[in-house]
Amino acid sequence: RHSFPTRRSSDLTSSEQQKQLPLIYPLLISLLSGAVFSFALAPYYYWWLALLSPALLYACLRKRSARQAFGIGWAYGFGLWFVGAFWLYTSIHVYGDTGAALSVVMIVIMALAMGLFTAVQTWLYRRFFPETPLTFAPLWIIFEWAKTWVFTGFPWLFAGYAFTERYLDSYAPLFGVFGVSFAVILLACALVEILNRRWFWAIPSALLVLGAWGAGFIQFVQPKASKPLSVSLIQGNIPQDLKWLTEYQIKTLEIYVNLSRTEWGRDLIVWPESSIPLFQTDIEPFLDAMNAQAKKTGTAWVTGIPYWDLPESKREGQPMYYNSIMALGDESEGLYKKQRLVPFGEYIPLSGMLSWVLPALQNDPSVSGFSRGASDQKPLLIKKHDLGSAICYEVAYPNLTRRNARQSDFLVTVSNDAWFTGTAGPWQHLQMVQMRAKENGRWFIRATNTGVTAFIDHNGHIVKQAPIDRKAVLRGELPAMQGETLYMRLSDWPVLGFSALLLLLGWFLALRANRPLAAGLLAGAALTVEIPVGAMLGLTGGIFYLAAWRRDGKPQAFLRF
């Protein structure tokens, strides 16, 4: 019974409430805990903070009322988003022509709004569920998932990203970033329970670690027999304050043409997002010349370009503008229109109310004029291969990238992170690309304006990386992959379904708080799934480790599904 506290906040006695620390202490601890969480992510990589931060929040909620839990969660969420997403300040202040004080105020408002996710999460936790990691962790995952779609979504600062290229990321090909987050949060809460001498929690913790070890030996994909493509990624380093100026447009094209001059003859050349700062109809002679040059040299050319057309829509006669990727050249064709747009980067939420605050952004076609592309777009055709596409912010959406990856041999993302240069934003962005590559078992090439331009393999490792904030050409090989990861097939539903089941059982447990059978039901249901899965993954890892050992001491094995 001690391992599974079952009382809700309303059940606390007056003596227990008197023993609690004043509310100001958990509020401050939660605020600081949320603030330090982002240092677990790129570019700092203090991964252990991703365990410590939620562990402190979990501890602060112990025996607190639902109302107090709301405030504690809001403090945590505010600290998390104010520090973790402060890189938005550069976009709003430097490139949005907004005063410094007002820019900070806007970041505060954003952090307060996003912090409500955690506030509602912790309120629900203390109002309807028993105090146990088996309800805290599922609620955390449900609210991470909600951030991918509520108000178009802002899917940033997930716990699972802290373990990119670290031990627990072996769960990514199985269950995606939410599966990694679930493991992180459950381990964090279990640590608190173990420190409180609830030794039972050593069992699920050990199973999670064992399962991660075994999952690391499972290979869902393997390279195709075809020869890898030779690829050149072009990084133009165009200053954002000059990029859309009419007098600088030709200079921008000259920079990219000159950087590409020695790359013709390679299989693929990739220019970054909106590297052509003109609509396709305004620059047709240039596109025709580049297409002819690419075909002449046997090269495929992929470039970011703003695109407009007149689709059938309710706004009859009104052109629709898109942030897009275009493929031209030898054995290459296709057009991809961006589906997910960046708030304050490509469109302005509540633009009618905020236009007086952000006059410069309203006049920038890269910000205020773009529409969303269709969800059923085909991959680009490159040298008889299918190239899945993602533009900038889209790689933050796991399921969107998964859909594109299912029909692709490899993936490309183009981006312009000059909006956030000199901040943690571009590095957090790159870390997400690494997780998407790991989830889907596909190589990812990333071409950016100012960085970070990189080649990322199907295991999420950075193979090559260009220096940031300078002109560069990054050359590498791009192998086509075949096969599907479990995550690619099943999406987020296994993790979301398991989380929903635990919450349903936890709610039932809270209603029947005085019945030992109900407490055992929650523990038993969780372990019924976790024990065989953890044991299976651990056993699989052991078999692979022993049976596939080679002279160099590195196990190589493939498990085909």
Pin down the residues of each PLM region:
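Short, conserved active-site loops that position catalytic residues or coordinate cofactors/metal ions
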Residues: 41-56, 80-87, 235-237, 265-278, ...
